[in-house]
Design a protein with these regions (language model features):
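Short, ordered, surface-exposed loop/turn motifs in non-cytosolic proteins
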Residues: 11-27
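Beta-strand-rich extracellular modules
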Residues: 58-60
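Intrinsic-disorder/low-complexity, polar/charged segments enriched in Ser/Thr/Lys/Arg/Asp/Glu/Gln
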Residues: 1-3, 41-45
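A short, amphipathic beta-strand motif
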Residues: 2-10
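Polar, enzyme-active/binding microenvironments
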Residues: 37, 63-66
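Short Pro-Gly-centered beta-turn/loop motif in secreted/extracellular proteins
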Residues: 45-54
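Extracellular beta-sheet/turn segments enriched in Thr/Pro/Gly and aliphatic residues
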Residues: 65-75
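Short, acidic Ser/Thr/Gly-rich low-complexity loop/linker segments typical of extracellular
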Residues: 27-43
Length: 75
């Protein structure tokens, strides 16, 4: 499972209602994961495996690299 926590850069407060989507790279494991919206804690959970890819928040690149566990991104 991969979880993403979205926080505001300035305050560190959670971002509620942000759309988070994932795009994985790789010939076999590549592809996109449908977006989900963060809860009141700024968290969203995907029942998927780990791998190299990009986390998008509201359509903007928030992190590129290996995605696993609980990823914290700032917007």
């Amino acid at each position: 499972m991969v979880s993403v926590k979205v926080l505001y850069k300035g305050s560190g407060n959670p971002v509620k209602g942000a759309k988070v989507s994932l795009m994985f790279s790789g010939l076999i494991s590549g592809g996109s994961v449908p977006g989900k919206y963060t809860d009141y804690n700024g968290e969203v959970h995907f029942n998927i495996g780990t791998g190299n890819g990009t986390i998008y928040v509201n359509g903007l690149d928030a992190k590129t690299g290996y995605i696993s566990g609980m990823e914290v991104v700032h917007v």
